[in-house]
Structures are given as C-alpha cells and as structure tokens.
Amino acid sequence: MNIVILAAGMGKRMQSALPKVLHPLAGKPLLSHVIDTARQLSPSRLCVIYGHGGEQVPQLLQAKDLSFAKQEPQLGTGHAVMQAVPQLDDHTPTLILYGDVPLTTAASLQRLLDSAGNDKLGILTVNLGNPTGYGRIVRENGAITRIVEQKDAKPAELEINEINTGIMVAPTAALKRWLAKLSNNNAQGEYYLTDIVASAVADGVAVVSAQPDHEWETHGVNSKVQLAELERIHQRNIAHALLEQGVTLADPARIDVRGTLTCGRDVTIDVGCVFEGDVSLADGVRIDANCVIHNSTIGARSHVRPYSHFENAVVGAECIIGPYARLRPGTVLAEDVHIGNFVEVKNSDIAAHSKANHLTYVGDSTVGSRVNIGAGTITCNYDGVNKSRTIIEDDVFVGSATQLIAPIRVGKGATLGAGTTLTKDAPADKLTVSRAKQITVDNWQRPVKIKK
C-alpha cells in the first residue's frame, strides 16, 4: 500500500512562523502523530507532501521509510497528490491522509481499507450536527456520486449532514488517471481531490465509505484554538486509558502525557503532573502534585513528593524524593534512597539507603550505601574548565555546610565535620574537619548607624 500525507498547508490562522504540521500535540508534531499511525498500517511507500516555506518538515522528520515531495505553488489537495505520483506503485492502493488531522486511529483507517479493497474508491465520512465549512457527500439511491465543497454547494446540498473528512483510498493506476482529468474551474480556482469521485463514478468504479469510531478522529487543526481543543481530547483519551489500566488519577482532567507513560499496578498520580518522553512507573509508585518527569524510570513503591523535577533519571525501589527535588540527567538512585527538599542531583550514582535530605548539590559523584549527606553540602565539581568526580564510600557521614572540592575521595566510614572544605582525600573511619578555630571577642559592640 502507498500512503500519501498532505502537509503543505500554510496555516495562516496559526499566526506562527512554524509550519502548521510541526506544531506540537502532546509534545510531538502534529505530522509525527499521522506518520506514526500510518506506520501501523505497514505501507510499502510513505510520502509526505510539504509546501513553500516548509523546508523544516523534511529536515526535522527525515527517516529511511519516508520520502518527500514539494508542492509549489499550492493549488489544492488534488494538485498536492499529483506531486506524489512519480513515487506511487500502481499495483497497490493509495491511502491519502492529512498532516493536520492527528487523531485518526489505525483501526478506523483499516476499516476504510477493508471496505475499499483493491478496486474501489473509499472515503472516510462522518455525520455532523453542524456540517458548515465541510464538503458534503452527495448520494443517489444510497450510492456516493460526488462530493461538493461548501462554497460550490447548492442550498439543498448544504442541508446534507454527511461530510467528507478528506481521507480516502483509491486504486493507484485509476487515481493517476483521475488526477490527470482534474480541473480548477471552481470558486477557489483549485484542483480539488474530491472531484475524482465523479471520475470514478463515470468509470464505473464503486465508491464506498466507512466511518471512524469517534467524530474527533477527523478533527483538523487550523488555529491555536483548535490545537488546544485537540490537546484536551488527546489528554482525556490518555487519562481514560490509564484509568482502565488501574492507575489512580486524582483528577483525570489534570494530567499531561507528552510521550509514553507505562504504569504498573496500584500507581497513584496527583493533579498537575507532566510526563514527557518515555516514563515508566513500577508497581505502587506514588506521584504527588505538580511534578514534571522526563524520560525517567521509577522503581516499585517509590514516593515522589510535590514539585519535583526529573530528567533522564533512574530511581530504584522504595525511594522518597522531594518535595522540590531535582534529578538531572545521569542520576541513578538505588533502593531506599532519600532525596529531600531543594536537593539537586546530576550525573551521579547513589547506592542503597543513602540520604541527602536538605539543600544539597550532588554532581558528578559516586555515593556509597548508608551515606548521610548533611544540609547545605556541595560537591564542587567544576573548576571553570573541567568537571571532576567525587567519590564517597559506604557509611560516610557528611556534616552540614560541607564543600567537597573534586576530584576527591572520602573513605569508608569517614566522618566530615560540619563546615568542612575538603581539598584532600579523607581517610576511612576517621573524623576530618577543616575550618577556622572558633573565637569569642569580649566587649564586642555592633556598629551603630551614623546620623547624617
């Protein structure tokens, strides 16, 4: 099967320099949603038609299974499909999709393909309560005879509620023949793809239809308002699927998934959470309110407290993270690790049962098991040019307000006194302290303000 995706629309109503089909829906370009659905149908050829000023489309979305053709000037949907003709295999049907209609399911498209077979013209239609603006499906004795656009429709035709979604499948050899016959003698001065219906009827080719499972599958995007509406529909669908899987959502209307979220049993997600990229939550994970989790894995029974931010992190089982914690790329936490409020961890491995509960930065570090990192501790990993690593072995106690100047190693069982600035390796099982001697000044008086 050939699949052609029309993605050349200028999108003037989007009020943006970005091509319309590259605007994100759930964190992914509209066109990418359509391409992903098309791939589920295993096409032999997949061609994207892009338009003037849309060179970003092939630049951003190039892949081995994609080919691209440019439509310039843009003279309608029929003209757009003409640009793909040299790339189409005559011996298999051609399915035509739209890059700004992102929510059509593979199941609905397969229903259309099954209806059309290899020798019929198939059209995906839908019945609308208010069909204004859409091309109407004109039937005679139940059979589709043509599609008439809104601007060209007669009053009686405007009363028709069955509309053309634009999605259709046709025998490719016949499609090429019908495209060659198209005329732009209409109100818009464009080559309408819908005019091939009349050609099919004239050739005695049966014109059949199928309908999607849901009306929203055919909704397109022409403005930021419509984009926002589709975002809510898409997020509602994701939330519904999570609920069906047994995930507890405090409010299904207040979760955003911008990628793939995989959940185990008895997962609980509070309001305002955003999941980006590939995120995996194991059994019993609890995510509190307003967390952002990007490309991360969280182990069983771990608890993420409010306002925490993860990016490319791996969290083990039974960890407690946050509130207000930040796990940056390269963070790997073993089981039962506690990362508390206003603690940032970057490119570091922290072994089991270790804790950094308050106001701490751990960067480019390897931390052993059962380590306690006191409040205000900083691993000083950057000298202005190079980044160096800090190694803290098992059973270390780091006192509050300690600075560890990397590269440095703290031996097993060592204790660092509060306020220490560590510039040399600390030996195992010993107390290391580095700070000025405390003094008390007698008869000390605070300065007084001088009146001017």
From Swiss-Prot:
Residues the entry annotates as binding acetyl-CoA: 375, 381-382, 400, 418, 435
Described purpose of this protein according to its UniProt entry: Catalyzes the last two sequential reactions in the de novo biosynthetic pathway for UDP-N-acetylglucosamine (UDP-GlcNAc). The C-terminal domain catalyzes the transfer of acetyl group from acetyl coenzyme A to glucosamine-1-phosphate (GlcN-1-P) to produce N-acetylglucosamine-1-phosphate (GlcNAc-1-P), which is converted into UDP-GlcNAc by the transfer of uridine 5-monophosphate (from uridine 5-triphosphate), a reaction catalyzed by the N-terminal domain.
Reactions catalysed according to its record: alpha-D-glucosamine 1-phosphate + acetyl-CoA = N-acetyl-alpha-D-glucosamine 1-phosphate + CoA + H(+); N-acetyl-alpha-D-glucosamine 1-phosphate + UTP + H(+) = UDP-N-acetyl-alpha-D-glucosamine + diphosphate
Region (N-acetyltransferase): 246-452
Region described as Pyrophosphorylase: spans on this chain: 1-224
Family classification: In the N-terminal section; belongs to the N-acetylglucosamine-1-phosphate uridyltransferase family.
Protein name: Bifunctional protein GlmU
Residue ranges, annotated region (Linker): 225-245
Annotated active site: 358 (proton acceptor)
Stretches of the chain forming a coiled coil according to its record: none
Organism, scientific name: Janthinobacterium sp. (strain Marseille)
GO terms under biological process: cell morphogenesis; cell wall organization; lipid A biosynthetic process; peptidoglycan biosynthetic process; regulation of cell shape; UDP-N-acetylglucosamine biosynthetic process
Keyword Nucleotidyltransferase assigned: yes
Location in the cell: Cytoplasm
Subunit structure: Homotrimer.
Binding site for UDP-N-acetyl-alpha-D-glucosamine: 6-9, 20, 71, 76-77, 98-100, 135, 149, 164, 222, 328, 346, 361, 372
